[in-house]
Design a protein with these regions (language model features):
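Positively charged n-region of N-terminal signal peptides that target proteins for export
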Residues: 1-4
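Sec-dependent N-terminal signal peptides
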Residues: 6-12
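C-terminal motif of bacterial Sec signal peptides marking the signal peptidase cleavage site
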Residues: 17-20
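Bacterial signal peptide processing site
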Residues: 22-24
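Post-signal peptide N-terminal segment of mature Sec-exported envelope proteins
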Residues: 30-48
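Short, ordered beta-strand-loop transition motifs
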Residues: 42-55, 151-157
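Surface-exposed helix/loop patches within compact recognition domains
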Residues: 51-151
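C-terminal or internal capping secondary-structure element at the end of a domain, subdomain, or sheet
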Residues: 149-190
């Protein structure tokens, strides 16, 4: 009887020892964030010969994720990136930046449009969401279509309402509606 008790205790200690030696599990995906708290507007100016107006990109960060002085991601959170946003020429001023209006996802290069997300040989382009954990990329969610409503709330503040779409792993279409309100920090990329 004691022999069975010792074997049972030994087995229990072995199981506890094994489970405590496992590496920590990565973040369990619970859905994309509804709010972004930091945003950079990358200003490319007149970047394409075939496109008449200026081009910008949006680089937004959720709580917990930030950029260091070298513009490298630190922390844990989400990064919504939308490249190739085609803004109208000047609008009566000298700006090359995002102006108020409704921008649609399409491949035309016309003002008030932006490119949809696409995976080019493992490289995300257009619009996508990165999940970063402790500065390391964990996942990429491509966004295939949608629109952005940009409002000026003050001379420096913007209100961005996104309605973006993507396909789930099972093929169903998912609507993603994040929001940002604040300053779009300019980052000259020309």
């Amino acid at each position: 009887m004691r022999k069975l008790l010792y074997i049972g205790l030994l087995g229990l200690v072995g199981i506890l020892g094994f489970t405590s030696c496992r590496p920590s599990t990565p973040y369990v995906y619970r859905g994309l964030p509804k709010e972004y708290i930091l945003a950079w507007e990358e200003i490319y100016g007149y970047a394409y010969d075939s496109v008449p107006g200026p081009v910008v990109a949006l680089d937004l960060y959720s709580k917990g994720l930030e950029l260091d002085a070298n513009h490298r991601m630190r922390g844990t959170g989400y990064n919504l990136y939308i490249s190739d946003i085609f803004v109208p020429e000047s609008h009566g001023n000298d700006t090359l930046r995002l102006v108020a209006g409704k921008y649609h996802s399409e491949r035309t290069g016309l003002p008030f449009s932006f490119l949809p997300g696409k995976n080019w040989d493992g490289q995300p382009t257009g619009m996508y969401v990165l999940y970063v954990e402790e500065g390391k990329l964990q996942s990429i969610q491509m966004l295939d279509s949608g629109y952005i409503v940009v409002k000026d709330t003050t001379s420096v503040m913007k209100d961005l309402e996104f309605t973006l779409y993507y396909r789930s792993a099972y093929g169903s279409r998912i609507t993603y509606k994040p929001h940002f309100q604040g300053v779009l920090y300019p980052w000259e990329k020309r």
